[in-house]
Structures are given as C-alpha cells and as structure tokens.
C-alpha cells in the first residue's frame, strides 16, 4: 500500500494538502471532523495566490482571485471575469486542457518543467465557494521515488526480502494492488495511469501519471540467509538485491512503463 502511495505521489491535490496540514493556521473548527467553510475559503485564497505567483495574467487588475471561467480559442487559454477577458502573461505556460474548448473541465499549465492541473467541476463540493467553479489544483510533486530494500522497511530475513521483491516486481509489471479497510469500507489501491489531455494544437497529450521509480539496494558488507552458497555461507545481500531487482526491471524495460 505504501509503495503504491509513493509511486502515485507524482500528482497531489494542493487543496487537500492545504486543508489537512498547518500550512494554513488551524482553528477549533478545522480540527473537528466537520467541514470548516472558513478554512475552505482560506484554501481557495492560497490557491489563487499560488496561481498569481507562478502564472500571472496579462491584465493584472483582473487577477486570479476574480476570474469566473475559462475557454480555449485558437490554441490560447482565455481567462474570463464575466465579460472581461485576458491571457497568461507568459502564454507558453499553457500546455493543454481536458473537455470542451468553450467549457473545459481541466486546464494544464507548466512552470519550470513541472505541471499543474486546474480542475473545473461545478458539481464538486469544493467548487461551491468558487466563482470559477475550480474544485482543486493538482500539482506535479514527487517526480521520482526511491524504493528501499533495507532500513526504511526493516527488511532483515528471507521473508522480508520476498515481500520487498514481490512489491518491486508488481511495480515494474504495473499490476501491484492493495486492498484495505477504512471506516468499515473496503478500498482498492492500484497504480495510476497516464494523464490525458488535448494539447494547444488540438492533438493528444499524455503526461506521466507515476513517479520515476528508483531502487535502493543493500550495501555489500551485509549477508543474508535467503540464499546459501555451496560452502553454506550466506549470500552477499547487495548482490542478491542487484540481481533480483534488475531482473524484475526487465518487465518495465520491455513495455517502458516506469514513471508513467
């Protein structure tokens, strides 16, 4: 489950991250199980300031805080405030969209080779306080992830190593899944697919849906009883790790799925 979380951490919700942490100051209401609308407003405001900072508009008087909608015209992102229209100051930061050009459901922007996705969903609960019906801002976060075979997962004996190798194999084959229960409900977690959009020139656009996965093998001074040599001695654990994890990677090399 945690390996899946790490692999899927390439794209994360800015709104969830803000609402659930102390980036925004906590109040008594926000600490309860109930939704705090005041905190929700603060999350939206923070999100708008984030967009203002990294994706400023041509018409600075309008500003991200005042926009009411989006549309795509001739490959350009048009940002609306009622009857007023403006564009990004740096138009190259608009990459593509999802949905209809005159009523997009998502806008994809890029800054310093990292992407963000503005989700527009008037039916979402989180969009009810938003004049542009933005329900979330998804940010490209963990571009790479290191999967450990030693200390951080406390892999000591043969049984532990088999679990590590099985998880790594599932990640490389793309079929790793985890089922768990929470609050009386059963959930299944699996690897995220690529993210699909329409580029500014009207063609299909795909972005990696998962982190680029790296593997950390054990140092060569350690040995492990999982495999015994002819003389009965334990195999050097680093060699065992290198051989088995590399063999698992062959599945990914054939279909080129890692970081997707």
Question: Which positions does each model-derived feature cover?
Answer:
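Catalytic alpha/beta active-site cores
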Residues: 1-260
